[in-house]
Amino acid sequence: MKEMINVVAVGTGGFVGAASRYFISTLVNKLNTSGFPIATLIINILGSFLIGLLTQLLMSLCPDNKKLNLFLTTGILGGFTTFSTFSLETVNLFQGGKAVFGVVNIVLSIAFCLTGVVLGKMLAKTIASM
């Protein structure tokens, strides 16, 4: 029964995260005419920041709440961020003759997503120490 509750927590969070990703992607893609996959980049940077922030806060404030951790990180942020879409869009850029965009997407994604995690963890440590 305990595992089923964990599965429900992850599944519910996954729904929230995936629906949020869809909403943001749709909104950003209506505004983006460049051909660069900015929506996925924004989502992955935001998700990276939030996973750094939330994991650090959860570790500091409620380390024993596994269900909340599963719901927020594995569920919501797992459903929100998307490495597979990043990969597909990058391959499509290369195959579509936009190699420069492909390289830029790789560099920006890695640099900003890692930076997002670090900044999120730093902010969480500051919040937790207040």
Curated annotation (Swiss-Prot):
GO CC annotations on file: plasma membrane
Topology in the membrane?
Multi-pass membrane protein
Q: Which UniProt keywords apply?
A: Cell membrane, Ion channel, Ion transport, Membrane, Metal-binding, Sodium, Transmembrane, Transmembrane helix, Transport
Binding positions for Na(+) per the UniProt entry: G78, T81
- Single Gene Ontology MF annotation: fluoride channel activity
Q: Which InterPro entries does the entry link to?
A: FluC
Known regulation of activity: Na(+) is not transported, but it plays an essential structural role and its presence is essential for fluoride channel function.
The answer to keyword Transferase applying to this record is no
Q: Does the keyword Ribosomal protein apply?
A: no
Q: According to the lineage, what is the superkingdom?
A: Bacteria
What reactions does this protein catalyze? fluoride(in) = fluoride(out)
Q: Which residues cross the membrane?
A: 4-24, 35-55, 68-88, 99-119
Pfam families, alphabetized: CRCB
Which terms does the UniProt entry file under GO BP?
A: cellular detoxification of fluoride
Please state where this protein is localized: Cell membrane
Q: Main subcellular localization, coarse class? A: membrane
Q: State the protein's purpose.
A: Fluoride-specific ion channel. Important for reducing fluoride concentration in the cell, thus reducing its toxicity.
Q: Entry's HAMAP family?
A: FluC
Give the family per the record.
Answer: Belongs to the fluoride channel Fluc/FEX (TC 1.A.43) family.
NCBIfam families, per this entry? crcB
What name does the UniProt record give this protein?
Fluoride-specific ion channel FluC
User: What is the species listed in this Swiss-Prot or TrEMBL entry?
Assistant: Ruminiclostridium cellulolyticum (strain ATCC 35319 / DSM 5812 / JCM 6584 / H10)
Gene name in the database record: fluC
